[in-house]
Amino acid sequence: MFQPREPDKFEAALHRFDEENSRDPNHENNQPRELLYARRLTGWVLRLCPDAAEELRLAARCQHICRWQIPRSSYPMTRPGYLKWRADLKKFHAQKAGDILREIGYDETVIRRVQDLNLKKNFPDDPETRVLEDALCLVFLQFQLADLAAKTAEDKTINALQKSWQKMTDDARAEALKLDYGPREKILLQRALNG
């Protein structure tokens, strides 16, 4: 059974991450979107790795912390603009997480590890980064695919599915195949896997 090294710090960190994400002005299911996302991601991490280390649990909870503060629309609507936005977001999330963990009193070793996970350093060689990436892909498939498919050209959706699938471990792929997809999403996933 998981026991944080210092339970008060761990609970304070989760509370602060949730507090920050509860400020998201965007909502889904009547909840701040990034708060909901953080909880979904944490759920998948713990499902894939019930004995996840404290650093992985922290990283899951803050992976997209305050994401709305750097909107996609603030970058050129091009592929290079998208990639720059994603790279800047990763750094922003890692910095924000580090600041919060430092305020709470975590040592720099823990902070660096959480930030390395946020930045997905050493992927795919680092097993914890693999778990986090698997969880990110599963959150996408379970909760975001339908929305993407509804507003994106079919070939781009299939491309996104193929990229996600390539990053996933066999265990995560098995979990993905158990998800309850809508009819259109099932067809798109099948085309992605057959293509």
Question: Where would I find each of the regions flagged by the language model?
Answer:
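A non-catalytic, amphipathic alpha-helix used as a structural packing/dimerization or gating element
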Residues: 12, 16, 88-92, 96, ...
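Residue-level detector of well-ordered alpha-helical segments, enriched
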Residues: 37, 52-61, 93, 110-114
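Long, low-complexity, intrinsically disordered polar/charged segments
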Residues: 59, 74, 79-87, 185-195
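Divalent metal-dependent phosphate-bond-processing catalytic cores, especially two-metal-ion Mg2+/Mn2+ enzymes
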Residues: 2-5, 12, 19, 26-35, ...
